[in-house]
Regions:
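Single conserved hydrophobic/aromatic residue that forms the stacking wall/gate
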Residues: 1-6, 10-11
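Short, solvent-exposed turn/loop segments enriched in Gly/Ser/Thr/Pro and often Arg
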Residues: 47-54, 97-102
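Short acidic, glycine/serine/threonine-rich loops at helix termini
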Residues: 7, 56-60, 104-109
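Solvent-exposed polar/charged
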Residues: 2-3, 37, 86
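Active-site-proximal substrate-binding groove within the catalytic cores of carbohydrate-active enzymes
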Residues: 40, 77-180
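The substrate-binding groove and active-site-proximal loops of carbohydrate-active enzymes
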Residues: 12-29, 62-76, 150
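An active-site-proximal structural segment forming one wall of the substrate-binding cleft
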Residues: 21-47
């Protein structure tokens, strides 16, 4: 996406691709398709979208459609997801973006789970998952057992409690089993 007037904003040398553009949709699908063809043993992809849309304009959309940019972006994202899901139905996909920023009902048919937050501290996580469960089913929330001490809070929480909290969503691990 690009600013139509003024200078573009770039964070950590990243920009958001214009998914309203079918050529960009083909490009992104092609990357995933090439990856899956080259490495067919891949069975899990985390789709990380931790970049806010800062450049509010599309070079693809005509000027009278710029107010529809967010809608067209989302529709283009769904088209890419539909193609990936159709070609790779057994591939597990996780949507991840800044604490659930990609968690929306429009993309739930294409993703098996979404990442609620990078904060994996079980004591804090239980409140996040409880709140999220008001809107989304528990099975959609990726919930992982993490190491102790926690890498964000440095809190040491008993393994059983961390497992219990992680089991209230879609269970995963951010820890080597041998280190449990």
């Amino acid at each position: 996406l690009r600013c139509l007037v003024g200078s573009e904003m770039c964070i950590r040398d990243r920009v958001v691709l214009d998914l309203s553009n079918p050529e960009v949709q083909d490009f992104i699908f092609g990357i995933v398709d090439n990856l899956m063809t080259t490495y067919p043993e891949i069975d899990y992809i985390k789709w990380d979208a931790n970049m806010s849309i800062l450049n509010h304009g599309s070079q693809y959309l005509p000027s009278d459609q710029q107010s529809h940019m967010y809608i067209e972006y989302h529709e283009g994202f769904k088209k890419v997801c539909e193609r990936i899901r159709a070609k790779y139905p057994d591939l597990t996909l996780q949507a991840c973006a800044s604490g659930g920023g990609r968690a929306n009902y429009g993309v739930m048919p294409y993703f098996d789970e979404f990442w609620v937050s990078d904060n994996t501290d079980a004591l804090q996580r239980i409140y996040m998952q409880w709140g999220t469960s008001y809107f989304f089913p528990a099975i959609a929330m990726a919930s992982h057992i993490s190491a102790a001490p926690n890498h964000q809070t440095f809190r040491v929480i008993p393994l059983k409690y961390r497992i219990d909290v992680a089991m209230s969503g879609r269970l995963g691990m951010e820890i080597q089993p041998k280190n449990m």
